[in-house]
Amino acid sequence: MIPTPSLVVDLAAFDHNVDEMARERPGSALRPHVKAFKSTALARRLRDRGGHRSFCCATLREMEGMVDAGLGEDLLLANETLDAERLGRLVRRSPGRVTVAVDSEATLEVAARASASVLVDVDVGMPR
């Protein structure tokens, strides 16, 4: 019996999908979202097999895990954060670029205090 929670992956299917992704969107043209698989081992496989060096994270904790695993070359925080100290520590520890998606003045101020790059999220009337 497999203990739960457990991540079970069909590596042949995973590798096939990575190969397809790499062919369609090589390198940094695709930014896989870490929350989809929550595994630095799979992120490393995406990097090593598919050449993907840019990743999207939902939380600072996911970003910290990626940096700790040596996968912090180009990270995007998709959700806002108000923790400037923690974000600043992450920016200083990361060997590459840390970008924060901002959709409010408060998040923009946090990103600026942390010296993070920003991606401005504009509501064009189709809120998600």
Which residues fall in each region the model found?
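Generic N-terminal amphipathic, Lys/Arg-enriched alpha-helix
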Residues: M1-V9
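Poly-acidic low-complexity segments
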Residues: V8-A13, D123
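Active-site anion-handling motifs in enzyme catalytic cores
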Residues: L11-A13, R25, G65
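Short, well-ordered alpha-helical scaffold segments within catalytic/effector domains
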Residues: L11-V18, T40, L60
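N-terminal signal-anchor module of multipass membrane proteins
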Residues: N17-R25
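Active-site-proximal beta-alpha core segment in soluble small-molecule metabolic enzymes
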Residues: L30-R128
